From Swiss-Prot:
Belongs to the RRF family. The keyword Protein biosynthesis applies. It comes from Shewanella sp. (strain MR-4). The keyword Protein biosynthesis applies. This is Ribosome-recycling factor. Keywords: Cytoplasm, Protein biosynthesis.
């Protein structure tokens, strides 16, 4: 029973780290990256559709994304969706392809993005700690039901703390890498 709780907690902590990493990937750096446009929704025939379902996003060079729209009639909708996103991008139309030059980030904008990334990292840490709290409370319930001993609970708490620290360290490493990436000019 305790092994199941531990396994579940480790899986959930791993998912927290992965979710934090995915959230940080959406924060724009100076480099072009297709995942930058993942959060954009396009009004396609009256339905809000993810951009990657109506177009192919690729990298043209270090500071330019290319968006190849599958249906030519949707080019204006895709262009409008990209312009209205809060990413500060201005696409240029070239037939069925949109070229999106990424402007260089100002020092102030970089610092704003670092604040956003740090908040995401803190959210990830809190989620990991919540998983730890849930796992420990589950084991304490087992102890109250006389299904495990107090020593088992102490041993479990120590083990959970070790892998909690390991997962938080992963989040901190992801944060450090993202901060370095953001501060590159």
């Amino acid at each position: 029973m305790i092994a199941d709780i531990k396994k579940d907690a480790q899986e959930r902590m791993g998912k927290c780290v992965e979710a934090t990493k995915n959230q940080m990937a959406k924060v724009r750096t100076g480099r072009a990256h297709p995942s930058l446009l993942d959060s954009i929704q396009v009004s396609y025939y009256g339905t809000m559709t993810p951009l990657n379902q109506v177009a192919n996003v690729g990298i043209e060079d270090a500071r330019t994304l290319s968006v190849t729209v599958f249906d030519r009639s949707a080019i204006q909708a895709v262009e409008k969706a990209i312009m209205s996103s809060d990413l500060g991008l201005n696409p240029m139309s070239a037939g069925a392809t949109l070229r999106i030059p990424l402007p260089a980030l100002t020092e102030e904008r970089r610092k704003d993005f670092i604040k956003v990334v740090r908040a995401e990292a803190e959210g990830g840490r809190v989620a990991i700690r919540n998983v730890r709290r849930d796992a420990i409370s589950d084991v304490k319930k087992l102890e109250k039901a006389k299904e495990c001993t107090e020593d088992d609970v102490r041993r479990f708490e120590d083990e959970v703390q070790k892998f909690t620290d390991a997962h938080i360290k992963k989040v901190d490493e992801i944060l450090a890498a993202k901060e370095i990436e953001l501060m590159e000019v």
